Amino acid sequence: ANHEGFDKAAEEGANIINIHHSKPLNPVINYPFYVRDSLVNFVEHEHSLGRKVKLYYTIRELTNYAAEIHALRSLGHEIFVSGVGYGLPWHCEHLIDDYKPAWYVELPGGKADAALVLNGFSRWINYYLEGLRWMFENYKIDGIYMDDVSFDRPVMKRIRRIIEKYR
């Protein structure tokens, strides 16, 4: 189960892989629940070779593939940041206005990952942390990769407790 040259990197001594979003194993941003089976199989394969796997998972934005997106919008601006809207085609068709568009990438089959900016200080943190706990328990990941962290110390301590419990 090669991941874009990781087997070659492993030959040179690499033993940890970061699975970023917008890649076949993790196609949409911050919603790795969408591709459970392929991730589980990949992590098991890498572990069998003595390698570790970290998964991209932040709280900055959320894909339009999230099943919860319309329920979260019903909470006003608590979860999604307010904005002009009228962003990408998916946004215009399904949300129209009053949101701030974020990450966008075209996916195979003419689909797109069209994320929305999240408010990082809301009840969504609890949902995010439960998702993190679930991934450690069910995917058996070894860690997460975050390229933007806006968590306060208490949230980082909660993240640490989750990681320490499962790894």
PLM segments and residue spans:
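Aromatic-lined substrate-binding rim segments of carbohydrate-active enzymes
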Residues: 23-55, 155-164
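Hydrophobic faces of well-ordered beta-strands that scaffold small-molecule active sites
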Residues: 1, 17-19, 53-57, 144-146
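Acidic (Asp/Glu)-rich catalytic clusters
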Residues: 6-13, 40-50, 136
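Conserved structured core elements
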Residues: 3, 28-29, 33-40, 122-129, ...
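Active-site-adjacent "subsite" loops/lids of carbohydrate-active enzymes
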Residues: 44, 55-139
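Active-site and adjacent substrate-binding regions of carbohydrate-active enzymes
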Residues: 46, 120-167
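Active-site beta-loop-alpha junctions enriched in small/polar residues
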Residues: 22-24, 58-62, 149-151
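Catalytic domains of carbohydrate-active enzymes, especially glycoside hydrolases
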Residues: 2-25, 138-139
